[in-house]
C-alpha cells in the first residue's frame, strides 16, 4: 500500500480582473439597512472589508493560488515544491506519477491512501480545482474521488464534528508531537510569499507534512 501525506500552502488571488470582481461583491452586513448607516459603514469599514475579501481567497481554489506543495511517500523524507503555481503543480503531479510507476513497474496505479490534516475539505479539493482551472492533466494515481478508506484526514479522525475541529498545532500538542508552527504559520504565508521567502515556506510546508504523518501514525497505532 502506498501512502501519500499531503499539505499545500496557498495565497490570495493576484489577478487584477478577478480581484475587481471579488471586491464588487463586498456588501455591508444585512443588519445595516438605513442609507446613512450604509454610507457610514463604507466609510469606516469598506476598505478593510475589500482587503479581507481578497485575503480570504487563499481558502478558495476558485480564486486563490497554490504557492507550495509538500508531500511524502510512505516513510520517505518530506519534499516540497514552492514557486509559481503552474510549475509547482506540474512538478508534484510528475513526482506522484513517477513514484507510482517505480513502485508498481508496469503502469501508474492509484495511491492507496491520502493522509492530511483537513485534506478532504481543503488540500485535495483546492488542488483539483486549480488543476482544472489551469488545464493541467490530473494523474490517475491520485484518488480524486476518494473512497473513505483512501482518505485519512487527521482532523476528522480526531473529531468528525466540524464545529469542534482541531488545528494541526493543537493536535500535535495533545499527542506529544513537535508542532510545526513557529515563526511561520498559515496566516503568514501570503506575506512570506510577498517577501520572497520561498525557502522558508517550503521548510514550513515539509514540517507540516512530517507533523501530519506523525499524528496519523499515532492515531492509527494499535499500541496503548
What residue ranges belong to the model's regions?
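Conserved non-catalytic scaffold segment of RNase H-like nuclease domains
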Residues: 1-129
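Metal-dependent phosphoesterase core characteristic of DEDDh/y 3'-5' exonuclease domains
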Residues: 2, 64-83, 104-203, 207-224
